UniProtKB/Swiss-Prot annotation:
It is a peripheral membrane protein. Pfam families: WD40 (PF00400). Residues 944-968, 1046-1058, 1083-1111 have a biased composition (Pro residues). Transmembrane segments: none annotated. InterPro entries: SEC31-like (IPR040251), WD40/YVTN_repeat-like_dom_sf (IPR015943), WD40_repeat_dom_sf (IPR036322), WD40_rpt (IPR001680). This is Protein transport protein SEC31. WD repeats lie at residues 7-47, 66-110, 119-159, 165-205, 209-241, 242-281, 368-390. The lineage of its organism: Eukaryota, Fungi, Dikarya, Ascomycota, Pezizomycotina. The gene is SEC31. The COPII coat is composed of at least 5 proteins: the SEC23/24 complex, the SEC13/31 complex, and the protein SAR1. SEC13 and SEC31 make a 2:2 tetramer that forms the edge element of the COPII outer coat. The tetramer self-assembles in multiple copies to form the complete polyhedral cage. Interacts (via WD 7) with SEC13. It is found in: Cytoplasmic vesicle, COPII-coated vesicle membrane; Endoplasmic reticulum membrane. Residues 765-809, 833-862, 969-978, 1023-1041, 1061-1082, 1123-1132 have a biased composition (Low complexity). It comes from Phaeosphaeria nodorum (strain SN15 / ATCC MYA-4574 / FGSC 10173) (Glume blotch fungus). GO terms for biological process: COPII-coated vesicle cargo loading; endoplasmic reticulum organization; protein transport.
């Protein structure tokens, strides 16, 4: 409890009601003596000024009125129209009841006193206003006098009870807080009486105290039949925890679970009256406390009762810290004083804070929006707290429209949809679009398109036959045809004989002698059937009519030649010949590109009539593009026409751009015209029309998106953006299935859909069955985690019992051996500073599927050379399930959906501690006592599996192995692989961008141990590490390069109590830290084949036989003595839902920036931008898992992202350089490149460079 204010008075008091600034009215207490022995009696007002920081603790009165008698009680009524601050009533010791107007009293008006009522014949002990009717005031006092006053009309006041019937004095009273006409009183005779004021009668009398005075009575604020009483008797104070009598009670009107009691033992105690729990207490140094009160409007401050030391303290119920005087310790009493006098100087402080918030701080009701259109509400229903989840729609019309459209699509009745849309179209452009789409549903769309353009095939009526007058004498009319007067019988052709033996009376000569040379050539060519030559002569002589007749006989080739020659000669011919030339030559592109745009309908009709089916879409697109170019020049009326061409050619990627512009225009028009709808509703409806149009068009044309697998440069990107927006609106209205349907139409690599797609999938994901969940809970945690690490590509290997060893063959002999291995799975530098802080990174499969995260496989070696093999108990060989070397490769576990939790971190049960048999100490030259030299491989190696260089595991225990096997191996090739055989899982050294830097980055080294050259060993690329636990050289036979071994187990920290290895399971890199800082070892894979040569040294007698994984054993003298904590659960790579809010600006700003750069970067930088994006995804994965990055690093990254967003690249570079200098251990994968051969930095640095170079 915190003391807020103090009033230096020994007085009775009352709080001001109402929402105004709190005031306290005090009246000099009857029977109390001031420190100055003053006889003055005053009514004073005090303003707390809790919002004034300059106000001191001790207050000064704002108004003072002198009274002729002292006060026993004060009451303050609710505000009213006549009295805006209420009425203050004073119960005087003289028996007078005085009323003041609080507002006039505060302003110092002379007429502040309203009235004085003198009905009591003795002192008035208690008064109180009715909480429901502020004009009703009850007063009780000596001689059993109890009056109910109507301040509006004093003539209606009356007395309860008969005069002389109760000689006791009323000491306290309280109105019921639920029933307006119920009043309770307490008397000096020990009686508690419940009165029915409406009936003016006594309802109930209680007496459980004998003749003990009732000091306080208070009704429960919530329950109308419950009240609490107290007596001031020291022998039985009734309210427990008080050592002496209780003087007053105050039940909080806002929270019935808080009750204050004040006693003569100088303590104020807070209670929960319903549970009987004591919430806390305040102990004071005061001699005697008087009644306390909780403020009726804002219960947090309450008045600690006035005491006879002359103070009224205003305190809070909740403690926020000790006061300055409470923090002081008691000072040593001066010499000669009473030792026990120190106790009076002990600080008295608050001894509690409320365990639960009071009701006025609790939320009685609350509401929150949830994803998927969910509205979560909680509140009190039928006296119980209830949570309700309902679906909320911002605009019910929008959700109803989307549902109706989705149902119509499911029925497949597109005709009814089209008819409805055409009839409801608001603009001509929209109606034209739907009409064109409707024409595409017909059996012959081209014919319908021609009809829509207004070029229906209407055969002209034959002209009426004109009767010609017979010509008389004279020649025929000039220009008349020779055949005009001919009859059918006189037809020249009909006179020719058509059958064998027929003779006519019209003989002719083949050559008359008057023929020209051309005629002769033509005749000769026709006789010989050489139509091509005859055609050439006709064309040369410009006899086009004869040429066409001959071409008809000569076939298509001749016809084409005649047509070409004809059109060539008609340069000044009518325009229809240009059209005819395009049609005949099947070259409609000339007509499309060169025809005047005002005749676009004619061009479109020609395309629909003559275009080849394969060229038709492209011709329509070309015509639409010409119309679009005209729009760009300012002729906007062509947009509808261009959309028609795109629709006819099924070019969705082109028409969707026009529809998007139309969408924006419709939205702007709706905002101008509508007076009731909000902008969201108008936008959502316009978007709904857009989506319906696109969806129906795709259904009608059976459109197939061929760019689903592309990573960028999508033609339909404007449509994808609308799909994402529509999915968000559908999700907000609870239509998750509809949202998911449209999100599935987007490419998987479309970045803007990642968040929406993940949220929808999580919201629609079904939970596990209750039975399965219960079964999982019943399993031990270790068993559950152990089962997850068993891969599906092979059965678990049998778990043999390791034999007891006689000597320790596991200690390395050479402290300076470099860490190189020929195994494509053995990672290099697993325990560098970067790797130690990133042990929980997700695997980065740059090359092999089994490459552990954070490690780069070493370059393929030609042999083991001088790098020795630590002798140990090997793992059991994998099951003999060999596959054809040329057969299909093993499907990675990441691509197998049926493997449950395949990527979870393994866990192992607690090991049994094996007793270590004492071994004699050997005299050795090694710097480590009792260290045995390394030998060759154990004699019991499985045939067909070459030995693999691997680090030293801890020695096995003597007992049987515990827990499930750590890892089983995949099926290997029968008989082993030939020398130099490529390993399908081993990445090449240059294929991994995450390889550690070569020797140029190595820290200062110790001098390496000189050793003989090995025919199998390549030259060293760096100095050996200064690690005394590195494996010894020259103790392992060589193996051919490219021989793959089992994938190593994931480098994880074991659970507590697992084991304490003495050295790393992987050979340390040249820049590894000391063994005391290295992570716990993991078991190395088993050998994969026989040795490729004689061993340098035979195995020691009694060496460990072949068996299962060696069990760890506690060994003193190593740097690691405490087991590491189990690895925390990680989210899958690419998940961005768990990025905390403090890190989300980094993801949002950098992600948006890389997408901007990616869209505008030149093609030659595509690979660099892609690599930068991959590095940033590593950063985002760490942010999502809340690992690796420290809070100060995240803060710096936020500043860096803000600088990039603000185009302040110099500041961003400065922050980046600081991170590279001081935080390189946290950002080696995403800040810059680890491979020097690339000769370029990537990650954040390259993003800054790209952003600086890419225009906005």
């Amino acid at each position: 409890m915190v003391r807020l204010r103090e009033i230096p008075r020994t007085a009775t008091f009352a709080w001001s009601p109402g929402p105004t600034q709190p005031l306290i009215a005090t009246g000099t207490k009857a029977g109390a003596v001031d420190a100055d022995f003053s006889n003055d009696t005053q009514l004073e007002l005090w303003e707390l000024k809790l919002d004034d920081a300059e106000q001191g603790v001790e207050l000064q009165p704002v108004a003072t009125v002198s009274v002729d008698s002292r006060f026993n009680d004060i009451a303050w009524s609710q505000p009213s129209e006549q009295h805006p601050r209420g009425i203050i009533a004073g119960a005087l010791d003289s028996g007078a009841l005085v009323l003041w107007d609080a507002e006039k009293l505060r302003t110092g008006a002379s007429d502040a006193q309203i009235d004085q009522i003198d009905k009591h014949t003795g002192p008035i002990q208690a008064i109180q206003f009715n909480p429901f009717r502020p004009n009703i005031l009850a007063s009780a006092g000596a001689k059993g006098e109890l009056f109910v006053h109507d301040l509006d009309d004093e003539s209606k006041s009356f007395r309860l009870g008969k005069a002389g019937a109760n000689p006791d004095e009323y000491t306290t009273l309280d109105w019921n807080k639920k029933v307006a006409h119920i009043l309770a009183t307490g008397s000096s005779g020990g009686f508690v009486t419940v009165w029915d004021v409406k009936g003016k009668k006594e309802n109930l009398t209680l007496n459980h105290f004998g003749r003990k005075t009732v000091s306080a009575v208070s009704w429960d604020p919530d329950v109308p039949t419950r009240l609490v009483t107290a007596i001031p008797t020291d022998q039985n104070p009734l309210v427990l925890a008080h050592d002496q009598g209780v003087l007053s009670l105050s039940w909080c009107p806002q929270d019935s679970d808080i009750l204050l009691s004040c006693g003569k033992d100088n303590r104020t105690i807070a209670w929960n009256p319903h549970s009987g729990e004591q919430l806390g207490r305040i102990s004071g140094r005061d001699k005697l406390d008087l009644p306390d009160q909780i403020q009726p409007v804002e219960p947090e401050p309450y008045s600690r009762p006035a005491s006879f030391d002359g103070k009224i303290a205003v305190q809070t119920l909740q403690n926020t810290g000790a006061n300055a005087d409470q923090s002081k310790t008691a000072k040593q009493a001066p010499e000669g004083e009473d030792f026990f006098a120190q106790t009076h100087a002990e600080p008295q402080g608050a001894s509690f804070s409320l365990k639960s918030p009071p009701k006025w701080l609790k939320r009685r009701a609350g509401v929150a929006f949830g994803f998927g259109g969910k509205l979560v509400r909680f509140g009190v229903v039928d006296a119980k707290s209830k949570i309700t989840i309902s679906t909320f729609a911002v605009d019910s019309d929008i959700s109803q429209a989307s549902e109706d459209f989705d149902k119509a699509l499911e029925t497949g009745d597109l005709t009814s949809i089209l008819e409805s849309k055409i009839s409801k179209a608001a603009t001509d452009e929209e109606k034209a679009d739907w009409t064109v789409i409707e024409t595409l549903t017909s059996d012959n769309p081209r014919t319908k398109l021609v009809e829509y353009l207004g070029f229906a095939d209407q055969s002209e009526e034959a002209p009426a036959e004109v009767k010609k007058e017979a010509q008389t004498n004279g020649d025929a009319d000039e220009g008349s045809s020779f055949f005009d007067n001919a009859t059918d019988e006189g037809n020249f052709l009909s006179d020719l004989a058509a059958r064998k033996g027929a003779k006519t009376n019209n003989p002719f000569q083949v050559y008359t002698g008057s023929e020209s040379e051309a005629d002769t050539k033509i005749t000769r060519a026709l006789m010989l059937g050489n139509f091509d030559a005859a055609l050439d002569v006709c064309l040369k002589e410009n006899r086009l009519s004869d040429a066409f007749m001959i071409a008809i006989c000569g076939g298509e080739k001749c016809v084409a030649k005649a047509q070409a020659a004809y059109f060539k000669r008609q340069s000044d011919a009518p325009n229809y010949l240009r059209l005819l030339a395009s049609v005949v030559g099947k070259n409609l592109w000339d007509f499309v590109y060169n025809a005047d745009l005002k005749d676009w309908k004619e061009v479109m009709a020609t395309i629909c009539t003559f275009a080849d089916q394969a060229e038709f879409p492209d011709l329509c697109e070309a015509l639409g593009d010409r119309l679009e170019e005209a729009i760009a020049e300012g002729t906007t009326s062509y947009r509808k026409d261009a959309s028609f061409c795109y629709l006819a050619g099924s070019k969705l990627e082109k028409v969707v751009v026009n529809w998007a512009q139309e969408l924006q225009e419709n939205e702007n028009a709706g905002l101008e015209q509508s007076e009731t709808d909000n902008s969201f509703s108008i936008h959502a409806r316009s978007l709904q029309d857009f989506i319906e149009k696109v969806t129906v068009f795709r259904k009608v044309t059976q459109f197939k998106d061929t760019e689903q697998s592309k990573e960028n440069d999508w033609k339909l990107e404007p449509l994808y953006a609308k799909y994402v927006e529509y999915a968000d609106i559908a999700s907000a209205h609870g239509q998750l299935a509809i949202a998911e349907k449209y999100l599935d139409l987007l490419p998987q690599k479309y970045p803007a859909a990642d968040v929406a797609r993940n949220r929808v999938k999580q919201a629609t994901r079904k939970g596990a069955a209750p039975a399965a969940a219960g079964q999982r809970q019943s399993q031990p945690a270790a068993a559950q985690r152990g089962q997850r690490v068993v891969p599906a590509y092979g059965a678990p290997a049998p778990q043999p019992t390791p034999a007891q060893r006689t000597a320790s063959p596991y200690a390395p002999a050479n402290p300076l051996a470099p860490a190189q291995t020929n195994s494509p799975y053995a990672p290099v530098n697993p325990l560098s500073q970067q790797a130690q802080q990133a042990t929980q990174q997700p695997p980065a499969r740059a090359g092999g599927a089994y490459t552990p995260a954070g490690y780069q496989p070493a370059p393929v070696q030609q042999g083991y050379g001088g790098y020795g093999q630590q002798q140990q108990a090997p793992l059991a060989p994998p099951p003999q399930n060999f596959s054809n070397p040329n057969g299909p490769s093993i499907v990675p576990a990441a691509n197998r959906g049926h493997i449950p939790a395949w990527n979870d971190t393994p866990d192992f049960g607690p090991p049994k501690t094996a007793s270590r048999r004492g071994t004699p100490l050997n005299a050795v030259a090694s710097p480590f006592p009792n260290q045995q030299q390394n030998y060759g491989p154990p004699g019991g190696a499985s045939p067909g599996f070459p030995p693999q260089s691997r680090p030293t595991p801890p020695p096995p225990p003597k007992g049987p192995p515990q827990g499930p096997p750590r890892m089983t191996s995949p099926p290997s090739q029968a008989g082993g692989a030939p020398p130099n055989a490529p390993n399908p899982y081993a990445p090449s050294p240059a294929a991994n961008n995450y390889a550690p830097p070569p020797s140029g980055f190595a820290p200062p080294q110790q001098a390496p141990v000189q050793r003989g050259a090995s025919p199998y060993q390549p030259p060293q690329s760096a100095a050996p590490p200064s690690n005394r636990y590195a494996p010894a050289p020259g103790s392992q036979p060589s193996a051919p390069s490219g021989m793959g071994g089992m994938p190593p187990p994931r480098n994880i920290a074991p659970p507590p109590g697992q084991f304490t290895p003495g050295a790393s399971a992987y050979a340390p890199s040249p820049y590894a830290q000391s063994p005391a800082q290295q992570a716990p070892a993991a078991v190395a894979p088993p050998p994969r084949g026989p040795p490729q040569g004689p061993p340098r040294a035979g195995p020691p007698p009694g060496g460990p036989p072949q068996g299962g994984p060696p069990r760890p054993e506690s060994r003193p003298g190593t740097g690691q003595s405490q087991p590491a904590a189990p690895a925390a659960a990680r989210y899958p790579p690419g998940d961005r839902e768990h990025i905390p809010m403090v890190s989300r600006p980094i993801y949002e700003i950098l992600g948006a920036e890389i997408q901007r750069v990616k869209a505008k970067a030149p093609a030659q930088y595509k690979a660099h931008v892609t690599d930068t994006e991959k590095r940033l995804n590593i950063l985002f994965d760490h942010l999502n898992n809340e690992d690796l990055l420290k809070p100060d690093t995240i803060q710096q990254m936020n500043e860096l992202a803000s600088n990039i967003q603000a185009k302040q690249f110099d500041e961003a570079i400065a922050i980046f350089q600081d991170l590279m200098t001081n935080k390189n251990d946290e950002g080696s994968n995403w800040l810059v490149s680890d491979v020097i051969t690339f000769d370029a930095d990537v990650g954040v640095k390259r993003l800054i460079q790209f952003s600086k170079s890419t225009p906005a």
